[in-house]
């Protein structure tokens, strides 16, 4: 009866330590260590009763030339910008992590794309945060018929595993990974160990049975995925939802994509009946701009392979104190300092006494 050993995981970055620490040595977060009981190595060996020979017989190996692959084998939606971010559509067996602040529109967008994916087969929506009635209510507001979309209010990954393997839906949406747990482990849902183990199970199902997954992940105050950084390395693509609550638009940014280009962005607007993609985002961003405005300029910005036209505004006033102020929003402050110095030195603009 060997006792289980305790280790500590940082809830911010997943750093593992044998003893508790007030500050994480890897990411610098304070009071982020959580105690997790791990099974001793001897017990793991004892529980693994399957012989090496039988395990080897179950392993499938393919010769490179015999692997079948269809380049057009992607699920597409009615949202061209969303498909562009995925590299032309969702591949079979692909695992996509969608992150963002709570309430920014992750669940809404995924419910809308689920309405498109149902044309290829059954779509399973697993929710640990909302009841089926709440999801149905939101779906009706989004004008979703619901035929072919199944809702599952389950949080145990082992039960989810059995159901998905038996029914084999084409696409599965998990909302969210922080609510799932593995009942064979002692730790509660949301801990780094649980998030890692549940994601491993999801990736296993996806690759073994060619089932595509979307995983919703919450982010911390500093913009990182809540849970181990390892989570981002385990999935095929990471999309991050950006935008302030006061803005009508949302930006979906591709931060990682094994099957497409990274740093691509798609722009959506928040409407009464859900998310609406903005194809001509430059026109949208400049719609309220007045021409011949002093201190206003339109500049092209490259994001991935797409060019956006954005407005840059500047305001210069006499400084009332000896040290002039430099207030910057949406731009790197150090670069503004360099540009100001260049303008003063080379263009002879007296900005040294201007705010």
Which residues does each predicted region cover?
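Short cysteine-rich clusters marking metal-coordination/redox-active sites
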Residues: 10-13, 24-27
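Conserved P-loop NTPase
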Residues: 25-33, 39-68, 165-167, 171, ...
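The Walker A/P-loop phosphate-binding site
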Residues: 50-142, 161
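Flexible beta-alpha connector loops of hexameric P-loop NTPases
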Residues: 72, 147-154, 182-196, 324-333
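Conserved nucleotide-binding/hydrolysis micro-motifs of P-loop NTPases
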Residues: 102-104, 129-133, 141, 155-159, ...
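Loop/turn-to-beta-strand initiation segments
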Residues: 122, 148, 168-171, 209-214
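Substrate-engagement module of ASCE P-loop NTPases
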Residues: 193-214, 218, 234-245, 344
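Terminal-proximal interaction/regulatory segments of ATP-powered molecular machines
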Residues: 332-355
């Amino acid at each position: 009866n060997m006792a289980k050993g305790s280790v500590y995981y940082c809830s911010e970055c997943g750093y593992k330590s044998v003893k508790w620490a007030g500050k994480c040595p890897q990411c610098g977060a304070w009071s982020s260590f959580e105690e997790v009981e791990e099974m001793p190595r001897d017990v793991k060996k004892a529980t693994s009763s399957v012989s090496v020979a039988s395990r080897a017989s179950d392993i499938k190996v393919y010769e490179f030339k015999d692997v079948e692959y269809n380049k057009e084998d992607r699920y597409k939606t009615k949202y061209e910008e969303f498909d562009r971010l995925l590299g032309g559509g969702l591949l079979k067996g692909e695992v996509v992590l969608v992150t963002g602040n709570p309430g920014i529109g992750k669940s809404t967008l995924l419910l809308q794309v689920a309405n498109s994916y149902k044309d290829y087969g059954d779509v399973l929506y697993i929710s640990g945060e909302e009841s089926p009635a709440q999801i149905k209510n939101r779906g009706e507001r989004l004008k979703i018929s619901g035929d072919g979309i199944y809702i599952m209010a389950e949080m145990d990954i082992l039960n989810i595993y059995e159901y998905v393997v038996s029914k084999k839906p084409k696409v599965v949406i998990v909302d969210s990974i922080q609510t799932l747990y593995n009942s064979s482990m002692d730790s509660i849902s949301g801990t780094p160990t649980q998030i890692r183990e549940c994601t491993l199970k999801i990736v296993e199902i996806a690759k073994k049975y060619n089932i595509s997954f979307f995983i919703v992940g919450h982010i911390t105050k500093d913009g990182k995925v809540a849970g181990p950084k390892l989570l981002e390395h385990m999935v095929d693509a990471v999309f991050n939802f950006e935008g302030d609550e006061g803005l009508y638009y949302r930006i979906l940014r591709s931060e990682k994509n094994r099957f497409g280009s990274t740093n691509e962005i798609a722009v959506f607007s928040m409407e009464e009946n859900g998310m609406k993609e903005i194809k001509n985002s430059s026109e949208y961003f400049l719609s309220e701009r007045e021409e011949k405005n002093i201190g206003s300029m339109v500049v092209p910005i490259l994001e991935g392979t797409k060019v956006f036209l954005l407005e840059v505004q500047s305001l210069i006033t006499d400084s009332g104190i000896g040290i002039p102020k430099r207030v910057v929003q949406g731009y790197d402050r150090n670069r503004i300092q360099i540009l100001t110095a260049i303008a003063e030195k080379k263009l002879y603009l007296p900005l040294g006494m201007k705010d």
